[in-house]
Each structure stands twice: as C-alpha cells, then as structure tokens.
Amino acid sequence: LAKWEAGTEPGYKSYDYYDMVMRKNVPQYHINANVTGGSERTNYYLSVAHTGQDAMMRDFKYERTNLQLNIDTKITDRFTIGAQISGKYEKTEDVGLPGGDGYYSAILSMFKMQPIESPYANDNPEYINNVHENGYNPAAFSRDIAGYKDNLTRNANINAYAQYDFSFGLTAKATFSYNYTNSRFDGYQYAYQIYTYDKEKDTYNGTPAVGRWRSQIDRSVPARYMQLQLNYAKQIKNHNISAVLGYEASDYDW
C-alpha cells in the first residue's frame, strides 16, 4: 500500500486519463457583419458570419461560415421581384478513433483504460504502450498518429419570386427555388506501432495496431421547387370574398 501511495515505482503508479483526454479551456469565436439599405423602390440585407470552435478533446475542431442576401425591388407600383440567397460552409475535424463517433470514443476511453495501466511503454513518451484496449489509448489520440475523420458540407439556396397586384383584388405570384447540397466525408485511420517493454533486455518490442481503414464519400443533391399562386380578396359592403388557387412542383436528384 505504501508503494501505491508513493506512486513512483514501476507497477505502482496510477494514471489520470481524464487529464489526458480533456482540456480545461478551449477557444471559441464568432464573427458577424451585416449591411442593410436600399432606395425608394429597393431594399436589401446582406449578412456574413463565421464561427470557429475547438472541442474539449484535442485535435477536434468545428467551423462554419454563413452568407445571407435578401433583396426586393418594385419594378412598378404593382410589379415586385425579389430573391433570398443563402450559402453555408460547415466542417468538422475529428481524430480517427474507433467507431463512428470520435467524441464518444474519446470519452469512452476514460472508462475503458485501467488507471494502473501506463499509456506509454515503460512511461517513455516515445513508445505507445500495448494496452488491453489499444484503440482507446489516449497516447494515440492525435490526427498525426491515429488519423482523421473529416466531414464537409457545402450548401447553396436561391429563392426567387415575382408578384403582380391587379387593381381588382387579384394577386399573382410565382416562386422558384433551387437548392444544392454537397456532403463529403474523408477518413483515414492510420496504422501505427504499439510497444511492449522488455525489462530484462531493456528493449521495446513493436507490433502494428489493428483495425486500420480508409474511406472517402462524396454526395451531391440538387433540388428544385416551383410554386404558382393566385390570391383573390375583395370586400363588398359587409361581405368578404377570398379565393386561392395554387400549383406546386418539386424534384431532386440523388
């Protein structure tokens, strides 16, 4: 018991895997700029925003950029056209840990690793230890050693409309939308060496870690939408008359 309390001799040390996996402070920032304006017949709004954040676990990152433009203009007193244009760039960077969710695997490692098990062979940080759960050894939790799993999403959306107001209570409006989404996954789980220390020979015996893989997925989905609408509203003395006629169509490609 005294040796465990001292924690200095090999085989009698304990290891805090929470401190190895989690960070106390992580940076986050958000930048936003917008402009509004116009004239007697035209109005516009433009906004650009960017968000960046590191995770509580090392080498995990997230960033997103958004763009939004709204504009409408009166061609005549009765005829109006307008558009809403938006775009998004979103990326997550993960470490190539076992399983589909790197965050979950990083947290799970704190419970899987034994506190009396060193992450490094002979406590030498040059050699990753051959532990009972090699894929969950935090000593390998970096993009340079374990690999990476990155997800990138790019999206653009355009909504355009034209509206005409007749003098007798009828309004005609046509709307067209186009959406394009591209999703890309790029993952590479590296093969790296793990070591067992031979105390008698003072050597480190290496063996490759198992379960390595490489995957890339690229998917684009364009979608289209159209709407034609007639609205009629009229008040005759104490009577209100209204009617709506519409037509919609949409399609998308996989």
Question: What does each model-identified segment do?
Answer:
Residues 16-18:
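N-terminal entry motif of extracellular EGF-like repeats
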Residues 40-44, 200-201:
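Short coil-to-beta-strand
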